[in-house]
Amino acid sequence: MRHPVVMGNWKLNGSKEMVVDLLNGLNAELEGVTGVDVAVAPPALFVDLAERTLTEAGSAIILGAQNTDLNNSGAFTGDMSPAMLKEFGATHIIIGHSERREYHAESDEFVAKKFAFLKENGLTPVLCIGESDAQNEAGETMAVCARQLDAVINTQGVEALEGAIIAYEPIWAIGTGKAATAEDAQRIHAQIRAHIAEKSEAVAKNVVIQYGGSVKPENAAAYFAQPDIDGALVGGAALDAKSFAAIAKAAAEAKA
């Protein structure tokens, strides 16, 4: 049975004070909550502080990060390696986010190489896929998602998805306040799972597929009630302890 994962992507937000306050607030809000894995991905500069804060609290919250490089060392100014992230306890690494694809021109092939390097280093890739508003209107949603998935599957084999997380994030719903309905999200999640099942039913059955795109406490339960939605990759709501904890609790309750 798939175990739900709710992950907060803090994006380019935070301060030293905010990191400590938010994580301590989350620990308090999540006390006694079981049945869901909760992860946070702070900006790279705050991964160290986040690790120390979580360790001091004896927290079960999983530490992640928002990006990685294709190298573990060398002359790559401004980059950070899987080995460095691993040293600071970060295990769940977001790759392929639409903001990276757009603002940093990261191609499907480049994202697939990051995926492979994370797996090689024993880390968990959180692979973001999803379509733009124009692609959605043109009926190309699944074609885009399949292309982004196949960049990994066709180079590394479908088994590479074992232990990884897929996050379906329709670009038109990220930070816009617009969100796919629970039924529409379920339809796409089922198609994503079916696409993987064409290569391996076992991998498809077990892979965690999150939904991302304006997930809030008010709509989280409706998403998690769907059979193929295994959690959420949360943006704005992850910056508030009560809101993010409410989403995690909704996942735990729905998937119990």
From Swiss-Prot:
<dbReference type="InterPro" id="IPR000652">
    <property type="entry name" value="Triosephosphate_isomerase"/>
</dbReference>
<comment type="function">
    <text>Involved in the gluconeogenesis. Catalyzes stereospecifically the conversion of dihydroxyacetone phosphate (DHAP) to D-glyceraldehyde-3-phosphate (G3P).</text>
</comment>
<keyword id="KW-0312">Gluconeogenesis</keyword>
<feature type="binding site">
    <location>
        <position position="175"/>
    </location>
    <ligand>
        <name>substrate</name>
    </ligand>
</feature>
<dbReference type="GO" id="GO:0006094">
    <property type="term" value="P:gluconeogenesis"/>
</dbReference>
<dbReference type="InterPro" id="IPR035990">
    <property type="entry name" value="TIM_sf"/>
</dbReference>
<comment type="similarity">
    <text>Belongs to the triosephosphate isomerase family.</text>
</comment>
<keyword id="KW-0963">Cytoplasm</keyword>
<dbReference type="Pfam" id="PF00121">
    <property type="entry name" value="TIM"/>
</dbReference>
<keyword id="KW-0413">Isomerase</keyword>
<dbReference type="InterPro" id="IPR022896">
    <property type="entry name" value="TrioseP_Isoase_bac/euk"/>
</dbReference>
<feature type="binding site">
    <location>
        <position position="214"/>
    </location>
    <ligand>
        <name>substrate</name>
    </ligand>
</feature>
<feature type="active site" description="Proton acceptor">
    <location>
        <position position="169"/>
    </location>
</feature>
<dbReference type="InterPro" id="IPR020861">
    <property type="entry name" value="Triosephosphate_isomerase_AS"/>
</dbReference>
<feature type="active site" description="Electrophile">
    <location>
        <position position="97"/>
    </location>
</feature>
<feature type="binding site">
    <location>
        <begin position="9"/>
        <end position="11"/>
    </location>
    <ligand>
        <name>substrate</name>
    </ligand>
</feature>
<dbReference type="GO" id="GO:0019563">
    <property type="term" value="P:glycerol catabolic process"/>
</dbReference>
<dbReference type="GO" id="GO:0046166">
    <property type="term" value="P:glyceraldehyde-3-phosphate biosynthetic process"/>
</dbReference>
<dbReference type="GO" id="GO:0005829">
    <property type="term" value="C:cytosol"/>
</dbReference>
<dbReference type="InterPro" id="IPR013785">
    <property type="entry name" value="Aldolase_TIM"/>
</dbReference>
<dbReference type="GO" id="GO:0004807">
    <property type="term" value="F:triose-phosphate isomerase activity"/>
</dbReference>
<comment type="pathway">
    <text>Carbohydrate degradation; glycolysis; D-glyceraldehyde 3-phosphate from glycerone phosphate: step 1/1.</text>
</comment>
<protein>
    <recommendedName>
        <fullName>Triosephosphate isomerase</fullName>
        <ecNumber>5.3.1.1</ecNumber>
    </recommendedName>
</protein>
<keyword id="KW-0324">Glycolysis</keyword>
<comment type="pathway">
    <text>Carbohydrate biosynthesis; gluconeogenesis.</text>
</comment>
<comment type="subunit">
    <text>Homodimer.</text>
</comment>
<dbReference type="GO" id="GO:0006096">
    <property type="term" value="P:glycolytic process"/>
</dbReference>
<feature type="binding site">
    <location>
        <begin position="235"/>
        <end position="236"/>
    </location>
    <ligand>
        <name>substrate</name>
    </ligand>
</feature>
